[in-house]
């Protein structure tokens, strides 16, 4: 079998499998909100669990099939930290400790993959109400406070679990780390006074632990859900 025939066969198989999966899920979209804790991870934070602040988000999710989806989210929170919280020696802040409290706005688009087919079991044979999942994507970060404004990109990576409460309600718990491209989310660039290079070398990041609740809508088979729509 030639390479061209093999590629054609694989493409046809993938197209058929995707089309079959897309006809099995009930709803195309989810919309909802999340609430949880946001934590700054950078030069002025000694622990992942330190300086956690309340945060909230709005979520819009496009469902491709019981395994895959794309989530668009906007998150609001606070980033706080202090040089007193770390054991690292910073020459500039020995006599005058540094602290900050900045406002964070994050917008991201992430690809999600469910380890098990997700659903009620009626729309897709073998679907489960509970599944763990992983996600990753791209985001934008805007931080303001202390007279400084920072706008940069970030790479969110995370994992979570979700549970289908009912045909239209979905409960999720997720944790993500947002790796930013800036070292000034805390208002200070390179407090070590050592030049560094590389895409993520000595840059700041932040994590978010959130509980989300979403509502499913836009039925794929409208004639099957006229009573619900």
Where do the PLM segments sit?
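Outer-membrane beta-barrel channels and translocator barrels
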Residues: 26, 63-67, 116-118, 164-166, ...
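Predominantly the C-terminal beta-signal and adjacent terminal strand-loop region
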Residues: 104, 166-229
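Structural signature of outer-membrane beta-barrel domains
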Residues: 38-40, 77-81, 116, 139-143, ...
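Short glycine/proline- and aromatic-enriched beta-strand/turn motifs that initiate or cap beta-hairpins
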Residues: 21-61, 210, 214-220
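Gram-negative (and chloroplast) outer-membrane scaffold detector with strong preference
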Residues: 66-147
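Residues that define the transmembrane beta-barrel architecture of outer-membrane proteins
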Residues: 27, 50-54, 103-107, 128-130, ...
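Outer-membrane beta-barrel translocator domains and adjoining extracellular loop/strand segments
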Residues: 44-48, 82-89, 122-126, 145-151, ...
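Residues on the lipid-exposed face of transmembrane beta-strands in outer-membrane beta-barrel proteins
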Residues: 33-37, 58-62, 109-113, 136-140, ...
């Amino acid at each position: 079998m030639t390479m061209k025939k093999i590629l054609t066969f694989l493409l046809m198989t993938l197209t058929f499998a995707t089309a079959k999966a897309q006809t099995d899920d009930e709803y195309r979209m989810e919309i909802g909100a999340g609430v949880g804790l946001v934590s700054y991870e950078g030069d002025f934070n000694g622990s992942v669990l330190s300086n956690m602040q309340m945060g909230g988000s709005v979520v819009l999710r496009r469902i491709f099939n019981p395994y895959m989806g794309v989530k668009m989210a906007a998150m609001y929170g606070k980033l706080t930290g202090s040089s007193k919280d770390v054991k690292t020696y910073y020459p500039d802040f020995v006599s005058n400790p540094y602290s900050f409290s900045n406002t964070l706005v994050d917008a991201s688009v992430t690809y999600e993959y469910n380890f098990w087919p997700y659903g009620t079991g009626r729309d897709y044979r073998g679907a489960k109400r509970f599944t763990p999942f992983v996600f990753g994507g791209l985001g934008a970060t805007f931080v303001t406070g202390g007279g400084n404004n920072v706008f940069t990109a970030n790479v969110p990576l995370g994992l979570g679990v979700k549970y289908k409460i009912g045909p239209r309600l979905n409960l999720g718990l997720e944790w993500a780390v947002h790796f930013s491209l800036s070292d000034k989310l805390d208002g200070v660039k390179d407090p070590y006074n050592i030049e560094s290079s590389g895409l993520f070398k000595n840059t700041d990041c932040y994590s978010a632990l959130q509980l989300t609740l979403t509502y499913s809508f836009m039925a794929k088979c409208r004639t099957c859900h006229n009573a619900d729509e």
